[in-house]
Amino acid sequence: MSDVRNVIIIGSGPAGYTAALYTARASLKPLVFEGAVTAGGALMNTTEVENFPGFQDGIMGPELMDNMRAQAERFGAELIPDDVVAVDLSGEIKTVTDTAGTVHRAKAVIVTTGSQHRKLGLPNEDALSGRGVSWCATCDGFFFKDQDIAVIGGGDTAMEEATFLSRFAKSVTIVHRRDTLRASKAMQERAFADPKISFVWDSEVAEVQGDQKLAGLKLRNVKTGELSDLPVTGLFIAIGHDPRTELFKGQLDLDPEGYLKVDAPSTRTNLTGVFGAGDVVDHTYRQAITAAGTGCSAAVDAEPFLAALSDEDKAEPEKTAV
């Protein structure tokens, strides 16, 4: 079992690395569990990022994360590319167990485990990620200028993605497995009014086609079983997100969608000394810049909490021998 640290950060990405930077600069010596596979977060799977302030010519997602990581490390953050398999956040001293079974202890924990896009679950889906398949229109839409694109989904996110993509695309086809949309009336009307957007109803994706890049989709009508081909070079999947909160169920309060609940505008959770930031608490914006902002907030919230603990320790009278 390790010595008690000031703060452990579970997760990386813009939120985790920003929290690490701020706590490190406050001389709190944070320990960061970046994740064995997901170190760097969702931006590790993107290409050029053009909407993060400070990079007028854009920056590749992995490079941005490497820069953030190096900056946090420069100020003394300890970064471990490992996963956390168990936590106990109930006591004054929190415990975090890594994949080797080592138990790490800390006075405060910042949760930045993020969320993951729901996938179609098709064999070629991951292989063509970044090669025509995407889960983020605002991240990748510009790269599909004058191309035929498909958007999968029927909710507000799918309509937002389709409307945004229509600025660049030659055409946008929304594929939905029902004959009505779940999106709000305003979002539906906006999509229906867009001359570049068309709909394929009662259908699902049966196959993502292509070798080195996306070549098209094979669709299946869910009522008749009939198969059809949809020739597109861009596929945007917008069927929702799943927050990575499985580890915290039964300890931290979650909202009905599974996202971590915080006492906004702060980042405090229902447990003293535990803070949440980034996409794990955000099912509205899900942008790198907003994640970084809440990572900063979590660090700033943790600092006075830890300072108060330190003051309490100093105030305790020394025990005299009898």
UniProtKB/Swiss-Prot annotation:
**GO MF, one example:** thioredoxin-disulfide reductase (NADPH) activity
What reaction gets catalysed by this protein?
A: [thioredoxin]-dithiol + NADP(+) = [thioredoxin]-disulfide + NADPH + H(+)
Tell me which Gene Ontology terms the entry assigns under biological process: cell redox homeostasis; removal of superoxide radicals
Does this entry carry the keyword Secreted?
no
Q: Does the keyword Oxidoreductase apply?
A: yes
Q: What is its EC number?
A: 1.8.1.9
Q: Give one Pfam hit by family name.
A: Pyr_redox_2
**Oligomer status and interactors:** Homodimer.
Which family, according to the similarity comment?
Answer: Belongs to the class-II pyridine nucleotide-disulfide oxidoreductase family.
Entry protein name: Thioredoxin reductase
Source organism (scientific name): Streptomyces coelicolor (strain ATCC BAA-471 / A3(2) / M145)
